[in-house]
């Protein structure tokens, strides 16, 4: 049994792909003919989605608080941390804007018309900027969690994080409790993720049965456009930053960081690529150890540029496909939330799932989009992690030029 568990854990990505393919085939050829298949997969899919949604709000809250606390505790690193944070947050904002504007300009998802059940969670819909501002502060934090008001949960987490930093040692005990809760939430989510192949199968069957082959075509098109956006962002934004701010040839930069980028693509983990990323920038680009030792690990935690592109892209794609209108004010909320959520997104495979669920809830998308997102998450995650790691190393090159290190 133990050997099977180890084998399954190592090959879970392949199992997810198998579940996706079987789900598509079942939805196309069996679900419409045998009603029991459609009923069974719908029920099991709902159970899987409920298990995931169960921990989304506490995980987002705890992750944001701990992310802010970890940044605050890094004050001893001085100007390097501050400069790195500024670089990462600016590029994340640009990435989120790119992810929102491209699908809107090309109307990605229009005409697909996904048929899905509406979400059980009441989304936070803001009709104007004034309504958004008035709804920022929760009068009752417990109600914000209970009613599924993700925007208020994010703001409450932000306030709590900075408050715990401000009170110093008195807040350490509560931080330890929140850290333990964060680890517990991650453990529960990771346990649920072991059932992802079955969950993907059960959630994709009703979608394919209702929408037919256009589901496959639309998702394939979306993936191609997404990867074009990834490549464009990496070469234009990071290449431009390295050239203009870092005074380094983009060709030299991309050639030097290729081993770390390919490793990130294969492992889907920014954290696991830290040693190789440090080696690339130090040995091939002359980045001082003092800069890389701070910037690379910090980037693995807070630099989620490609994830911001991915999540914004997916939100707009599913909104168009499901007929959900995303107003300008909601786009602004998503952009700001993307920047905030990047602080708490763990640099591990599938770390963006909770963040996507939070944004999907805010945008008022049907609960069923989560199943479709998870089914293609690994394909998206490979490219996203690769771009994130490139961004970490680009930050190192920029900081090498902008910050003087005493020898």
Give short role names for the model-derived ranges.
Residues 39-50, 79, 135, 143, ...:
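Short amphipathic alpha-helical coupling elements at transmembrane boundaries
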Residues 56-60, 199, 269-277, 291, ...:
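Transmembrane helix boundary and interhelical junction motifs in multipass membrane proteins
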Residues 76-83, 187-194, 284-299, 328-330, ...:
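Membrane-interface alpha-helices at helix entry/exit sites of multi-pass transporters
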Residues 111, 312-407:
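Transmembrane alpha-helical segments and their short flanking loops
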Residues 36-40, 78, 213-221, 249-258, ...:
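Membrane-water interface of transmembrane alpha-helices in multipass transporters/channels
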Residues 259-342, 396-397, 403-407:
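Helix-loop-helix junctions within the multi-pass membrane cores of secondary transporters/permeases
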Residues 4-7, 13-17, 22-32, 49-52, ...:
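Signature of multi-pass transmembrane helix bundles
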């Amino acid at each position: 049994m133990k050997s099977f568990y180890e084998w399954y854990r190592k090959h879970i990505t392949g199992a997810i792909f198998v579940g996706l393919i079987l789900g598509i085939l079942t939805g196309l050829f069996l679900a419409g003919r045998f009603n029991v298949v459609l009923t069974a997969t719908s029920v099991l899919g709902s159970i899987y989605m409920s298990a995931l949604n169960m921990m989304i709000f506490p995980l987002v809250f705890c992750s944001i608080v701990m992310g802010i606390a970890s940044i605050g505790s890094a004050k001893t690193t001085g100007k390097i941390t501050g400069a790195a944070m500024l670089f990462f947050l600016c590029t994340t904002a640009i990435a989120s804007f790119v992810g929102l504007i491209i699908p809107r300009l090309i109307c990605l998802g229009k005409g697909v018309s996904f048929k899905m059940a509406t979400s059980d969670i009441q989304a936070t819909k803001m009709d104007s900027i004034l309504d958004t501002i008035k709804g920022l502060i929760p009068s009752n934090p417990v109600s914000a969690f209970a009613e599924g008001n993700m925007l208020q949960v994010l703001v409450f987490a932000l306030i709590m994080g900075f408050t715990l930093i401000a009170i110093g040692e008195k807040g350490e005990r509560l931080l330890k409790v929140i850290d333990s809760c964060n680890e517990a939430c991650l453990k529960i989510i990771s346990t649920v993720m072991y059932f992802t192949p079955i969950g993907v199968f059960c959630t994709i069957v009703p979608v394919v049965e209702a929408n037919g082959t256009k589901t496959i075509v639309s998702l394939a098109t979306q993936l191609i456009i997404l990867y074009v956006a990834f490549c464009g962002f990496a070469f234009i934004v990071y290449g431009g930053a390295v050239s203009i701010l870092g005074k380094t040839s983009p060709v030299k930069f991309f050639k030097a960081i290729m081993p770390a980028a390919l490793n990130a693509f294969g492992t889907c983990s920014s954290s696991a690529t830290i040693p190789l990323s440090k080696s690339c920038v130090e040995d091939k680009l002359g980045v001082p150890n003092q800069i890389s030792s701070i910037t690379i690990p910090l980037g693995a935690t807070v630099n989620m540029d490609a994830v911001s592109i991915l999540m914004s892209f997916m939100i707009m794609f599913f909104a168009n496909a499901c007929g959900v209108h995303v107003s300008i004010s909601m786009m602004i909320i998503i952009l700001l939330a993307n920047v905030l959520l990047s602080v708490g997104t763990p640099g591990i495979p599938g770390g963006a799932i909770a963040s996507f669920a939070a944004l999907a809830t805010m945008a008022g998308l049907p609960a069923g989009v989560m199943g479709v997102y998870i089914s293609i998450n690994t394909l998206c995650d490979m490219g996203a992690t690769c771009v994130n790691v490139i961004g970490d190393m680009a930050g190192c090159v920029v900081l090498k030029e902008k910050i003087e290190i005493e020898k």
